[in-house]
UniProtKB/Swiss-Prot annotation:
Pfam families: Tlp. NCBIfam families: SASP_tlp (TIGR03090). The keyword Metal-binding does not apply. The keyword Thylakoid does not apply. GO terms for biological process: asexual sporulation; sporulation resulting in formation of a cellular spore. It comes from the Bacteria. Belongs to the Tlp family. It comes from Bacillus cereus (strain ATCC 14579 / DSM 31 / CCUG 7414 / JCM 2152 / NBRC 15305 / NCIMB 9373 / NCTC 2599 / NRRL B-3711). This is Small, acid-soluble spore protein Tlp. The gene is tlp. Induction: Expressed only in the forespore compartment of sporulating cells. It is found in: Spore core. Keywords: Sporulation.
């Protein structure tokens, strides 16, 4: 029997995902300051993707509210 589709806490879960992504972004930014040029470029690219994810997650939160 499939599990019921309970979405009552989706906004809360999405907000937690946003906070985790922001935390990871900030930690990576600190790491980038101490990294070589190649690693710094990779970190900056990943952080750009994180910013895009944060925007998408915030949009989903609005949809859930």
């Amino acid at each position: 029997m499939p599990n019921p589709d309970n979405r009552s806490d989706n906004a809360e879960k999405l907000q937690e995902m946003v906070q985790n992504t922001v935390d990871n972004f900030n930690e990576a930014k600190e790491t980038a300051e101490l990294s070589n040029e190649k690693d710094r470029a990779a970190i900056e690219a990943k952080n750009q993707r994180r910013l895009e994810s944060i925007d998408s997650l915030k949009s989903e939160i609005k949809d859930e509210s």
